[in-house]
Amino acid sequence: MNSLRSAAVFAALAFVSIVYAPRAHASLGRIECRSMRSEILSRAVRYCAILPPSYDENKTQRYPVLYFLHGLGENEQMLVSSGGWNLIEDLWEQKRTGEFLIVTPDADTSFYINSRDGHRRYEDFFIREFLPFIERSYRTRFGRRYRGIGGISMGGYGALHLAFRHPELFVSVSASSPALVGALPNVKFSNPRQSRLLGLLGVFGTPPDPAFWLRNDPLTLARSAHLDGLKIYFDCGTEDDYGFEKGARSLHDTLVARRIPHEFHLYPGGHDWRYFAAHLPSALEFHSRAFGLSPPQ
């Protein structure tokens, strides 16, 4: 892969300008979009929480929580603005899942890791500040068995990275079209006008550090992480615009070789909201099962 094509792939990790026209739908839950102050990041971090139908009706009930991570170029409102909210309400209305919270934090271009230069410690923020904050602020159930993580594209990379690095914290992980590419592409620019493209990879160093990339890569982590008890689901389109199906196959092969149970699917489709919308329900049903929830009768 030449440098310009490599750059284009990662510039395009913004991938999806998610546009999905909302439709009339009787509300079955509630959305809160707020912010919290992070000492680690030295800034406010926005997040959106999707609260299940009975959240406001039963003030004593506690719920599992799914942390759902957005892709590059998106933000905490990904599920709210994309039509994902309608899909989630459909699942509740059709009684295909139990009730749990879904929380999406804004992650900018962090890839959900601590940056190479140490200035953007998003992983530390997420584990040390964000999880405790959400679980203090909302009526979540306590413990690993009631906490899942999932994501799309860059968010799929982040979900796998965080779950494989901290398997003691999560009972389940899902990733749709995760940004898995193996070895870091050779991306070098001498023209400062191209620095914006390189900036998309700045979290991995400037220039990007291949060794640092590999240390954080879910494909690397999957080879040795202690994944006992972690339920794993991932999928990708067979015509993924960025070739991420190859990385998904590689992850599948690694888990098979280690005899680690997981659910893996290659479906027809590319890297766009049409693909994600078609398969997001399966991921949410997977997490519902992992939480041990039965759909409401």
Question: Over which residues does each language-model region extend?
Answer:
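Bacterial N-terminal signal peptides that target proteins for export
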Residues: 1-11
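Intrinsically disordered, low-complexity regions enriched in serine, threonine, proline
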Residues: 2, 20-22
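Non-catalytic cap/lid and distal C-terminal segments of serine-dependent acyl enzymes
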Residues: 25-297
